Each structure stands twice: as C-alpha cells, then as structure tokens.
A protein has these predicted regions:
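Short phosphate-engaging motifs
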Residues: 14, 47, 111-112
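Conserved RecA-like P-loop NTPase helicase motor core
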Residues: 68-156
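Active-site catalytic pocket residues across diverse enzymes, especially alpha/beta-hydrolases
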Residues: 26-29, 55, 59, 119-123
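C-terminal helicase lobe
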Residues: 3, 126-185, 189
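Conserved helicase motor "Helicase C" RecA-like lobe of SF1/SF2 P-loop NTPases
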Residues: 34-70
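Conserved interdomain hinge at the start of the Helicase C-terminal
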Residues: 1-40, 50
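Structured helix-beta-strand junction loops
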Residues: 28, 34, 58, 80-81, ...
Length: 191
C-alpha cells in the first residue's frame, strides 16, 4: 500500500491536476466574493513539498507548512497563510484554526471524520471539502467508505469530472474513467 501511495504522489499529471484544482477554487471564490482559507492535506510529505513549492513559485497565494516537528511560533505564522500544507496526522491532532473553511484531501484515506469535521464545524463559513478519488481498486474501496460517511452525515456531494489527461505511461490520450473524479462537498462537505 505504501508503494502505491508513493507512486500516486509522484505521478506528475496528478500533482499538476491538484495545483489546477487549487487555482480553480481560489478563482471561483474571488469571483463569488467568498473568503477561502484552505488546508491541503496528504500522507506523503513529497507531494506536500511539491504543492507548497508550486503554489509559492506560481504565486497562487500565501502558503505555509503545518507538519510535525515545527516550532509553535512557526505553526502560528502558517495559520495566517491563505493555504496551509499539512499532513493528515497534524490535521487530526489539536488543530484548531477557526477560519479554515476549505479542505483538499490529496491522498486517499478511509476515515475522514476528524479531518472533515475541522472544516464543517462552523456554520455559515461556506465550507468546502475536495476529496480526490483515484481509480485503483484499493483507493476506490476507500472512497466507498468515505462516501458512506458523507451520505450518513447528509452532506451534499457534487462530482466534478477531472481534466487530467493521462495515457500510456502517463502521457497521451484522455482517460474517461468514472473513478477519477473529484468530489466536492459544498455548504456541508464537497467531494
């Protein structure tokens, strides 16, 4: 499983797709005059590093890390950034950033109760959760469990077809695969 996750995190078209999702969320928020405070989370630090650097280098928004081993003062500085790059472990611990209203889950996970709860606990802040669904059997099964949780909580689920172009060996033709969707949960939880 860890090898599959590693390869998933290193797949360049997927990483670029995630950056484009972040850009789209920020643009839509600006167009609708919605203030977004975004947390991007993953298990794997390599994808977090990639996303942090891409966001910074493309000047998408202010960005900072929220990962284990950081000093308290550095975590506080990161809390003021528009985009917070964090591990699932840090997002599930004593995280209490009241202004967070957007979550982008970049790696699959079965139990998202605590993570999603961080975003959805404050009513009226236009909460948005983006849950990226990957097509491998194992990851699809994890999605089914997350979807059951979302349905149980009566979150509104909207599907967005991905715009990632993938072919043999990662280049070429477009894949039209039901499993490769982003799910958005809006005003509840957007997948």
């Amino acid at each position: 499983y860890s090898q599959m996750l590693k390869k998933l995190c290193e797949f360049e078209p997927r990483r670029q797709f995630i950056v484009s999702v972040i850009q789209k969320i920020i643009k839509e928020a600006e167009d609708k005059d919605i203030k977004r405070h975004i947390m991007v989370i993953a298990h794997n630090k390599s994808i977090l590093t990639y996303l942090h650097n891409a966001i910074r280098d493309m000047n998408i928004a202010s960005v900072g890390y929220y990962i284990g081993g950081m000093k308290e003062k550095d975590l506080k500085i990161t809390e003021s950034k528009k985009i917070i790059i964090a591990t699932y472990a840090m997002a599930e611990e004593a995280l209490d950033i009241k202004t967070l209203n957007t979550l982008i889950m970049t790696t699959p996970k079965t139990d998202v109760t605590q993570t999603v709860g961080r975003i959805l606990r404050i009513a009226g802040n236009n909460p948005l959760v983006v849950d990226i669904i990957d097509s491998h059997y194992t990851f699809k099964n994890q999605w089914k469990k997350r979807r059951a949780f979302y349905n149980k909580c009566k979150y509104t689920i909207k599907y967005m077809k991905n715009e990632m172009i993938v072919g043999e060996n990662g280049a070429g033709a477009a894949e039209d695969n039901e499993g490769e969707n982003s799910v958005f949960l809006q005003n509840k939880c957007l997948l």
